[in-house]
Amino acid sequence: MLKRFFKESLIYGLSTYIQKFIGVFLLPLYTALLTPEDYGILDLLGTVAIISIYLVVSGTDSSLSYYFFRKEHTEERPVMVSSTLIIRLTFASAAFIIVGLLSHKLTFLIFGKDYSLFLILTGISLAVQSIYSFFTDLIRFEKRPWVFTFVSVSNLLVNIGLNIYFILILKKGVWGAIMASVISYGLMAGFTIFYVFKRYGFHFSASWAKKILVYGSPLIGTAFAVWILTTTDRYFLAHYRNIADIGIYAVGFKLASFLGLVSGALQMAWSPYAMDIQYESNAKKIYAKVFFIYFVVNILAVFIISMFSIDILKVFTQPAYYSAKAVVPFLCMSVVFFSGYFIVSIGIAITKKAQHTIWITLTAAAVNIVMNFLLTPTIGAVGAALSIMTANFLIFMLTLSVSQKLYPVDYGYFKIAALFLPAAVIVTVSYYFDLKLTIKIILGVVYFISAGTYLYLNLKNSDEMKMILKKIKSMGSKNKAAEAAFVPDDLPENPA
């Protein structure tokens, strides 16, 4: 079972890797042709799209995930899936109309200027993205990762081609970036509708619609709190600093989002996998292993990105964006804590106690607002990054605490801390003394050797490590046998 999970994670990771690669590919394009202010406008428009998508989804993704894997509802999947898509289509249409009607007032409120056309296009983009996200969720539930990868890659290739055309060739700037998203996701939304109704039929059940909405409705408050949690920093920066600072901050976030290669892949495979194995006798043991592997891999990834952030920025951006280096470590850890929350919330999901996510997220959002109010006016983007990292750490810890009470799992906290603390010290020293690249490479090699040794000593008696060592020994034996097979029997004797 665990092998299947990591196989699916690897496939999802391939798709995520390509997404991140394309993100890297577009970053030089954006930073070369868009000013930090333009990039800031795009980022703020993105925050409007995020809350709109959350409201459109309205927890229906979690609802479908829950009912899709209930054994007693297997035969009802067609009407369940079709009804959920119809709900999504209805909410997406309503969201677009509302954003369109309020576009003029909203843009003046956010930017102090009339960017209503940009916001209307963003409204179209959010509508089609929310429909496309239904497809990606469904494909994961169906455990068809290769289909997910194919469709995702197709979408991304179209997106990157349109970005190059609109921004590089036509010089359309912000408008071009949004239009590329509208067209690429619009095509995928059309495919989603065709796929679902072709595969599951066109059905609508009021009773299933009610079940889906009742299960997901508590998550609307959570979604709103998550939006506050993840976007407050931009609005504080816009108020106390300027739009250009948001652009620089957004580039730092883009760098931190490379962690999505690991976090996103595990997260996409995790929800259907975790719910599917809940009835297995060794489910808790598997949950603990996934938790440990998730944090080990992410700590190592955060170490690399944080240590070499300025070097990465010099390769992929322009000098105007180099100051994003200061926020990268905090934003990286923020991503790790936020994605880790999905891993440790398994107890809440299994026991159907989703209401806990509301107060947990609201608490974290409140802390984020207070910290932004205190820190952003004085230390700018660094204060915003510290605020979101602290808030996501809080949401992770509170979720872990509640989930453990509902469904205890024996996680190995000390082993994680032993890896994290040395990494944090090395990165801090590197930033404080602004170390040269060669010294950072040496420190990185030393840390990885130490971490590898530590992991080996702690895991050498585990079943997985024994299996790996057994395979290595087996390969060695086969190689020796192969070598012996090629030694002739009639070799001449040694003349000596």
Task: Provide a role label for each language-model segment.
Residues M1-F5, W146, V174, G190-T230, ...:
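Interhelical loop/hinge segments that connect adjacent transmembrane helices in multipass membrane
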Residues S103-T122, I305-V336:
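Interfacial segments at transmembrane-helix termini and the short loops linking adjacent helices
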Residues R4-S62, A92-G100, S125, N155-I160, ...:
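Signature of the first transmembrane helix
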Residues V56-H73, F141, G252, A256-F291, ...:
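Helix-loop junctions and terminal segments of transmembrane helices
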Residues L64, T136-D137, F141, P145, ...:
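C-terminal transmembrane helix end/exit motif
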Residues F5, Y67, E76, V128-V151, ...:
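Membrane-interface junctions at transmembrane-helix termini in multi-pass inner-membrane proteins
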Residues Y431-A496:
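Membrane-proximal transmembrane or re-entrant/amphipathic helices at the cytosolic face
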Residues I120, T149-F197, V214, L362-V367, ...:
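Hydrophobic alpha-helical transmembrane segments
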